[in-house]
Amino acid sequence: MLWLDMGLGKTVITLTSLAHLLRTGFLRGVIIVAPIRVIRLVWRQEAVKWEQTKHLKFSMVTGTKDQRTRALLRPSDVYLINYENLGWLAETLQTYFVKKDRPLPFNGIIWDEISKMKNSSTNRVKAFRKIADKFDWTTGLTGTPASNGYKDLHGQFLVVDRGERLGTSKTAFRTRFYRKVGPYKEVPYEDTEDTIKKLIGDITLEMSAEDYNPLPDLMVNNIKIEMPDDLRAKYEKLEREFFLVLDSGKEVEAFNQAALTNKCLQFSNGAMYPVAGMPLWEPVHDLKLEALEDILDEAQGSPVLCAYAYRSDAQRIMDKFKHLDPINLTECKSEVSLTNAMHRWKTGDCALMIGHPASMGHGIDGLQKNGHILVWYGLNWSLDLYEQFNARVRRQGQGVPVICHRILMQDTLDQAQAMALDDKATTQAGLRNAVKQYRLTKGA
């Protein structure tokens, strides 16, 4: 398991390792499982940059079912597949190889952003376990191993060591390391942290960027916005009654606590979706747009990278600042459009670039070369997405401190999100440091 900070070269390190193992004959092939954008834009492109890996032959196991099958049967060194197709992969390998007693075309597997396998009860983890014993070499890559606490580790190590260190049962894992506090809450035992660190330390290599080449400072600036009294009254009514009538006459209703949380966050951002799952939204206020405008004015033309939470946020930002010809990187679906967008940013021809953190984290590099200002128009609950997005600018090659503006509505769930992210970061940093110390004491 490789826990390497963003920007430390996980891709080329892994490519070099697998090229060596292919050359020695230990591996006959490797399949890499990664987010779809990374599959399309990262691994092949990185391999051709280096003398020791440019010879590797890749097969893209994407597209329709027939296209994936043909790609899987095509002789290659490295096969690339996205997480969403893991179930299909397990079924197809069983049909074409396992049941016919044929060797798989690969005996090595790499999990790029293995944190996506953190939940051991998901179908993708269950599907892989059916073929897990067919692999002689497994590597997991991530920069955010425990963004939501130690429970995230069970599924990740299950697909790496088949349950040798943390067990095969999620229920048994929780019983062993957590105690119940009330009907729904669980907290770790006092020795949980130390025990887990010792169990996983022998196969976990941690490397922090700041240990080798210090990253620039991240200066977090929380911009807290006060709601006017009339807007505050509406927000409080929504939180209290799970119901609100908008100025347009449209009714907004939340049927459970999770839905209410989402509605409150939409309200804070300035637009709401009256009907869940429908694309139509209604404006509520422009307070965050005004705050973003102030940030852009202060930047005086320096490129600003802005994270949004909802499609309504993106549309309103693009409309408000259309005179800047902004780029929504999330909408750059092809390699050509992504390349053009990155070129505009790197040449100083883009004052505002926006994107959803889920599509902006993995596989986007180069933004640090011409920008140092981040804005969170709306936060999320995922530390992984939060740190990955920030790392687009705060990474190797950045020469100045990075400014991270977080636009927060005062006394709303915006602040709860900020506090939750800060708390999770403390837990993960402690885990990474402890694993590093464990390996040092072992002389690894």
Task: Write out the residue ranges for each language-model feature.
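SF2 helicase motor core recognition
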Residues: 87-90, 148-150, 313-318, 338-342, ...
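Conserved helicase ATPase motor motifs in RecA-like P-loop NTPase domains
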Residues: 6, 135-150
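Conserved helicase motor
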Residues: 37, 59-68, 83-88, 118-122, ...
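A conserved SF2-helicase RecA2
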Residues: 381-444
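Conserved helix/coil segment N-terminal to the catalytic DExD/H
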Residues: 65-78, 83-105
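Conserved Helicase C-terminal RecA-like lobe
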Residues: 6-9, 13-35, 214-239, 243, ...
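Inter-lobe coupling linker of SF2 helicases/translocases
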Residues: 80-86, 98-99, 118, 122-136, ...
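Conserved helix-turn-beta segment of the N-terminal RecA-like "Helicase ATP-binding" lobe
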Residues: 38-63, 160-163
